[in-house]
């Protein structure tokens, strides 16, 4: 399994629409950087957010998530409250090759401010926007800048193609657009 370089990422994105829209260079002046880097791609956070609230004083249950636990926000700057959490999505839409897994890591610019980004791996055959989990670990409000970098994606090509892709098994987040809240498949 090998880490893929900029040339491979560019070719897959331009010829097979792996990343749409695709930024061929690294944009970094006056913004949190985004675009193609040496061995990865820095994704942007869109201007759509879901910010957690405790107005209803409910327990967060991943098996029975209540949409009233979040407040929708759209704007150029999202303020995540102290010790709180927000969901967002990427500007980019991904179409993962059947022999490639992607791992996403938060940007150090945000991490150095106490803002932690989590994204689960992009599995082979996955397609859709990426839902981003943002934690403000500080006792202060934190700014997230829409349409700027939020995390870096690293692409790992397998030595051989997997038997069953995310698409083949009809993954519950396949073809997601916008911010997708937790889903649990119901037993038949």
From Swiss-Prot:
Molecular function terms, GO-annotated: dCTP deaminase activity; nucleotide binding
Record carries keyword Transferase: no
Residues where dCTP binds: 107-112, 152, 166, 176
Any GO BP annotation: dUTP biosynthetic process
Keywords linked to the UniProt accession: Hydrolase, Nucleotide metabolism, Nucleotide-binding
Catalysed conversion reaction: dCTP + H2O + H(+) = dUTP + NH4(+)
EC number: 3.5.4.13
Subunit structure: Homotrimer.
Function: Catalyzes the deamination of dCTP to dUTP.
Family from the record: Belongs to the dCTP deaminase family.
PANTHER family listed in its UniProt record: DCTP DEAMINASE (PTHR42680:SF3)
Full protein name: dCTP deaminase
Source organism (scientific name): Sulfurovum sp. (strain NBC37-1)
Gene transcribed to yield this protein: dcd
